[in-house]
Design a protein with these regions (language model features):
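Buried, small/hydrophobic-residue-enriched core segments of structured protein domains
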Residues: 4-224, 243-246
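Gly/Ser/Thr/Ala-enriched C-terminal appendages of enzymes
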Residues: 100-118, 139-148, 172-173, 180-186, ...
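Structural preference for beta-strand elements that scaffold enzyme active sites
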Residues: 162-164, 193-197, 233-237, 263-267
Length: 382
């Protein structure tokens, strides 16, 4: 397999499976379905997560101090929207290649187990303390107002911890315009950051206006690149309907208004991993075909003679169905781009593909941090 964390163009084989026992000639075809069902969606999530990370890299580089961490810009909020726990865990593990934050907490244990990591000593994944609508509604029912619970969160429940607070259970702008200013003393004395969390409405409009209002109430500083940064006691997290397009729109509008990208963090939900909205508004469903994830038989031995196997349907007008034939050599060209040469009659030993599993043994075991650094160019902050 090509080493995990490598960016691979469509059409370049990532995995090559070869049978090593003469009594199990068709084992490669049997295992093909199992491998695809386990791998394609985490691969797609890793790719989509990397797209968000590249976007974060761009806006952090333009508007934020260089020491800030773009891998904290987006969190995985998608667990409850996935088809099952196992899928949520595997896919959030893929997301954590690009970012450090997830609300799918079992993914952290999954990485600990399968990548010999230790979440107690390594920055594998970070969750967050956060309220939910049931918390806000229950306390409102008892107190008769929202301000009492906001103050209790700041002074009694989490006086020394950052937390997010869903803020639109009843009247979001009343929370921003009246309740938070009335709690300014408690917020500024709080040993942590309060992240307000809008959860409905027009994402771009609400996010940008919220940051402007918080700046007017709580102030902040101007960073080394000339962009405004909210006081560290206050911020915003948006986790409703995030897409690549509207996340970019938020950061772009903030940039135009002189605010740094790190004033807001995003919670990316399951919709973003199930469909991608293109700039023209067209929705593309995320399937195996989206990133060309498929496995095909390319080589066999019949009566001791090697044969090349391939498919090339005449009705395939998109030219995406034609497969490689024979054993493949994956290599880097002079520009460092991955290329494929096929037609070999034996497993190629000197290319990018390397043995990962053979005859019951694992080879080339790597840490999760090794894979992260490979994906992010060896420097997670650029």
């Amino acid at each position: 397999a090509i080493p995990e964390g490598t960016l691979v163009p469509m059409g370049i084989p990532c995995i090559e499976i070869t049978n090593t026992h003469p009594d199990f000639a068709w084992v490669v075809q049997w295992i093909e379905c199992i491998l695809q069902v386990e791998l394609w969606k985490p691969c797609a999530h890793a790719t989509i997560g990397h797209m968000y990370r590249e976007l974060a890299n761009d806006y952090y580089k333009m508007t934020c101090d260089d020491f800030l961490r773009p891998e904290m810009a987006c969190s995985d909020f998608g667990m409850r929207g996935m088809s099952c726990i196992e899928e949520a865990v595997r896919c959030s593990s893929a997301w954590l290649l690009s970012f450090d934050k997830t609300s799918t907490i079992p993914a952290i244990d999954y990485i600990d187990t399968y990548y010999d990591a230790c979440c107690w000593t390594e920055r594998i994944g970070i969750g967050a303390v956060s309220t939910e609508h049931s918390c806000m509604a229950s306390n409102f029912a008892v107190d008769g107002d929202e301000i009492t619970f906001v103050k209790r969160l700041l002074t009694e429940l989490y006086p020394n911890a950052s937390f997010s607070m869903v803020s639109d259970t009843y009247d979001y702008w009343n929370m921003i315009d009246n309740i938070l200013p009335a709690c300014k003393k408690e917020i500024m004395q709080h040993n942590g950051k309060l992240l307000v969390r809008p959860d409905s409405g027009d994402m771009v409009e609400i996010a940008v206006e919220t940051i402007e209002k918080l700046w007017n109430t709580f102030g902040g500083t101007v960073n080394s690149k000339g962009y405004k940064v909210l006081d560290p006691h206050i911020g915003i997290i948006y986790g409703d309907g995030c897409t690549l397009n509207n996340v970019k729109q938020v950061w772009e509008e903030l940039k135009k208004k002189g605010f740094a990208a790190n004033n807001i963090v995003f919670g990316v939900g399951a919709f973003c991993f199930s469909a991608v909205i293109e700039p023209d508004g067209h929705i593309v469903v995320v399937t195996r075909d989206m990133f060309g994830i498929a496995m095909k038989a390319t080589y066999g031995i019949v009566n001791g003679e090697p044969i090349m196997i391939y498919k090339d349907p005449k009705t395939d007008t998109s030219h995406l169905k034609k497969s490689h034939k024979g054993c493949c050599c994956i290599y880097h060209d002079d520009n460092g781009e991955l290329q494929c040469m096929d037609g070999f009659n034996d497993v190629f030993r000197d290319g990018v593909l390397r043995t990962v599993f053979k005859d019951g043994e694992m080879y080339h075991k790597e840490t999760f941090e090794d894979i992260r650094e490979r994906l992010n160019g060896g420097n997670k902050d650029e």
